């Protein structure tokens, strides 16, 4: 009976991946337009901008009834608008993400760091439920990091998930074959067993991306030595208190504390707290957008996990994926 269930599961996966590949996305409503400024609280001439970064880090577009730009495009749009606003004196980036793809994580880090250098204003990272792996990578572009007491962070490292479905497919009489120009062309295929030589090649790529992660942490946490960072960067997660004790973050604090720190670093006695949103989004306080957009692991449903079993490109991830 157990073997029958396994076969049925394989057939379901194959069917679903086929359906997904042939799906057509139909957008019934018009795009929601450019981001607009929304004032949340405070008074004064200067502004502290609150930016939200929630969910899986990916360059995939957000399809649905209301099409949205991917998170890289949205983040760039927000930073571009802020760079042109002389009244924006500080930025708080609220992070709630388990990470995502290596390249998308690095692009976000690069864009935020370039913005900070050119704008010459303080940037504070405020970590929510999860700011792990790629989420922590992004925080390295900030001037200070505050975490909630219940935040989970860390997971410094790289992962590439592959699936070997050869044995299961053999049980249902399915055989996959690839015609290639060279022996390594189908490395990582889920339809055959990976050779030791191929595993070593993948490991070399992962090691390279891991060294990149370490160098970014070194630049963002100059208080830590290279030896300390290497010891902390074994992939484990940390609570907010543990991360502070290890020197991975600066302090324990809530979003209000991050906003106050931003005002202090910008030399503002008072300031307007503003954020950006699109048409149709209701935001009346500093927590509105966080729970309206879908965050953390809830957003993992939007990630194309099926690509890992349908022969898609293996994903190199800065991702906490227990």
Residue ranges and their predicted role:
Residues 2-125, 130-131, 140-148, 159-322:
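N-terminal organellar transit peptides
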Residues 132-133, 152-156:
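Short gly/pro/ser/thr-enriched loop/turn and capping motifs at secondary-structure boundaries
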